[in-house]
Amino acid sequence: MNRQKNNLIFQYSAVVIFFLIVMFGLSLFLAGHYTPGGGFVGGLLLSSALVIITVAFDIKTMRKIFPWDFKILIGIGLLFCLATPMASWFYNKNFFTHTPFEIPLGILPPMEMHTATFFDLGVMCAVVGTVMTIILSIGENE
């Protein structure tokens, strides 16, 4: 993909749209265990935000903004997906037994989380890594 020229409106709107999609994807990720959403949908939204940045600018610019290798992100995601259900074994519980816990937020009411959130985080990392690896490998071959 070559850098597009004279697309100032598209490039500036892509940056705004990027942040909107990332915020919506993170809210779907955090609400995912109790409502529709979760790691897969959040990962698809995050990778679509990265694809918008890639299309608006180019692959070289996207790699400058996000310098990590997305294949490593797949491995990190799979590690989370494997470690989360196995962690229940250390507490003498059945495989994939999840436990709720609360995160204190100071003056705000505590945020209720679930250990399944870490599994969803692994799914999200694996989805973002897979989608971006496929998109970037297709784009770099042109």
Curated annotation (Swiss-Prot):
<dbReference type="GO" id="GO:0008324">
    <property type="term" value="F:monoatomic cation transmembrane transporter activity"/>
</dbReference>
<keyword id="KW-0406">Ion transport</keyword>
<dbReference type="GO" id="GO:1902600">
    <property type="term" value="P:proton transmembrane transport"/>
</dbReference>
<dbReference type="InterPro" id="IPR007182">
    <property type="entry name" value="MnhB"/>
</dbReference>
<keyword id="KW-1133">Transmembrane helix</keyword>
<keyword id="KW-0813">Transport</keyword>
<keyword id="KW-0739">Sodium transport</keyword>
<feature type="transmembrane region" description="Helical">
    <location>
        <begin position="37"/>
        <end position="57"/>
    </location>
</feature>
<keyword id="KW-0812">Transmembrane</keyword>
<comment type="similarity">
    <text>Belongs to the CPA3 antiporters (TC 2.A.63) subunit B family.</text>
</comment>
<keyword id="KW-0472">Membrane</keyword>
<keyword id="KW-0050">Antiport</keyword>
<dbReference type="GO" id="GO:0005886">
    <property type="term" value="C:plasma membrane"/>
</dbReference>
<comment type="subunit">
    <text>May form a heterooligomeric complex that consists of seven subunits: mnhA1, mnhB1, mnhC1, mnhD1, mnhE1, mnhF1 and mnhG1.</text>
</comment>
<keyword id="KW-0375">Hydrogen ion transport</keyword>
<keyword id="KW-0915">Sodium</keyword>
<feature type="transmembrane region" description="Helical">
    <location>
        <begin position="118"/>
        <end position="138"/>
    </location>
</feature>
<dbReference type="InterPro" id="IPR005281">
    <property type="entry name" value="CPA3_sub_B"/>
</dbReference>
<dbReference type="InterPro" id="IPR050622">
    <property type="entry name" value="CPA3_antiporter_subunitB"/>
</dbReference>
<dbReference type="Pfam" id="PF04039">
    <property type="entry name" value="MnhB"/>
</dbReference>
<protein>
    <recommendedName>
        <fullName>Na(+)/H(+) antiporter subunit B1</fullName>
    </recommendedName>
</protein>
<feature type="transmembrane region" description="Helical">
    <location>
        <begin position="12"/>
        <end position="32"/>
    </location>
</feature>
<comment type="function">
    <text>Mnh complex is a Na(+)/H(+) antiporter involved in Na(+) excretion.</text>
</comment>
<dbReference type="GO" id="GO:0006814">
    <property type="term" value="P:sodium ion transport"/>
</dbReference>
<feature type="transmembrane region" description="Helical">
    <location>
        <begin position="70"/>
        <end position="90"/>
    </location>
</feature>
<dbReference type="GO" id="GO:0015297">
    <property type="term" value="F:antiporter activity"/>
</dbReference>
<keyword id="KW-1003">Cell membrane</keyword>
